[in-house]
Amino acid sequence: MDQLTLTNPVFVTYTIAASIMVLKVMLQGWITVVRMMSNSAGFVSPEDSKAGPANPKPRPGQLDLNDDVDRSRRIHRNDLENIPAFLAIGLLFVLINPPLVAAQWLLYGFVAARLLHTLAYSTAQR
């Protein structure tokens, strides 16, 4: 298991890529909440539309779909479908001791693809 040490540049590459992806998943959930609060719409649960500190002025329709909120929610779901598999497969990839350049291309390539996917999807690109 010498591959799973910070002296292994392939493992360092993996830890950087994995850290960015975990932060992205965590941040996307909060982005959805911010969009929900700023639009005062797109709430999921009936209790979300009741008066309270997070919803001082309830109004009809807060439980209706809101494209801005729902788009962010779909990005988050897509992250939750793809990033855990990347974390597992990436770690297995480190264990086979691949060439550093190949690891950098594949691992950082995945990170770039996920970030570009988020940008394209959040701005409704096709």
Model-derived features: positions:
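Membrane-embedded alpha-helical bundles that constitute the cytochrome b-like, heme-associated redox core
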Residues: 28, 33, 96-97, 101, ...
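N-terminal signal-anchor transmembrane alpha helix
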Residues: 8-55
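Core segments of transmembrane alpha-helices
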Residues: 77-92
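Interhelical loop and helix-boundary elements at the membrane-water interface
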Residues: 74-77, 122-126
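Physicochemical signature of membrane-embedded alpha-helices that form the seven-helix bundle of GPCRs
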Residues: 17-20, 73-76, 106-109
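Transmembrane alpha-helical segments of integral membrane proteins
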Residues: 108-124
